Amino acid sequence: MDEDTRLRDGPVPRGDEGQRLHSGEGQVRRSGLQGPVAAARAAGTGVYAALDLGTNNCRLLIACPAGDGFRVVDSFSRIIRLGEGISTTGSISDAAIDRALAALSICSDKIRYRRARRLRLIATEACRAASNADGFRDRVAAETGIRLEVIDRETEAALAVIGCSPLLDPQGRGAILFDIGGGSTELVRIARDPDEQDAVPRIKAWMSIPLGVVTLAEHFGGRDVTAQSYAMMVQEVAQYIAPFAAEHGGGLRNMHLLGTSGTVTTLAGVHLNLPRYDRRRVDGIWMSDADITATIARLLGMSYRERANNNCISVERADLVLAGCAILDAIRNAFPLPRLRVADRGLREGMLVEMMREDGALGGCR
């Protein structure tokens, strides 16, 4: 992400009763830094850091307030596949732990170098599911100084909404937001009244399913995907989504899909025929239903090697992208909306906005 990228501050989404969604598991540890890295927080600078350790990716965003949004001063993203094999073994592998520690050490160095004073450092599905997650987090704290907060799925959905709400169509009545992760997928129905000035988006309903690109690809195979295996993936996801769609899939007029995930950003890059992935070209673009169908068909027609050689996919995503497309197709079938807005933003941006609002800091760097 470019250092001068500015993201507008969107309204805080609230639930049916006007209450912000929150973690309901009082026993989870809060995030933070310890050891030598803690000195960065004590320095008192106006810099914020948000880290998202997911099942597939490790992502960091460091920013300071700028007007009604924030200015990114540093970032990091690396595919580490922390959740590789968890669906069969139940634990994080030694190789995955080593990959995560290497990435988190870089994040720790960046946080210290940028003297971030306000931090939120979260972990998601892999650390919710793995039997050795506590030991892994203890080792992360000991070796990198990063103390991870394992968030629940409700909090994950709420942060995605905060991060992506600036991309809601201001003339629309809301969206079906989805976040396709490595080990889980979140769906949120967001409502807004376009006739109200400064209409605040509200979370009407949400759900999370324990399927993501890593778990689905491990179960059905991600390298050599046939029409039959692809259809089976779509059907598997559809079974999880069906009850939510039956209850919350009506009255979709003047709404759109809003997707945040490596799947949709990759799909957008391929759709645009980009020579290499470019966030500035992808974040916020609209794709029609026909665009999505054509691009997925194009990917299904590629071999694993062809996908790996595409610079918007690369070898890191070549065995996962079709599993993500299957999840997207299941969502499209359940919520047949004509447009998708693509978001290259999400949990990190949500954490930054939330922290800055809590501090009353949306007014510039100190």
Residue locations for each model-derived region?
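N-terminal basic/disordered segments at the start of proteins
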Residues: G44-G69
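Local beta-strand/beta-hairpin segments that build beta-sheet-rich folds
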Residues: A43, V73-S75, R137
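A short acidic Gly-Thr/Ser loop motif
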Residues: D52-N57, F178-S184, T260-T263, G346
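Helical "lid/coupling" subdomains associated with nucleotide-phosphate turnover
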Residues: T5, G15, Y48, I62-P65, ...
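Broad gene-expression machinery/nucleic-acid interaction feature
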Residues: N57, S75, A175, G182-E186, ...
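N-terminal glycine-rich anion-binding loops that anchor highly charged ligand groups
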Residues: D68-L82
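Non-catalytic pre-domain segments flanking phosphatase-related domains
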Residues: D2-V47
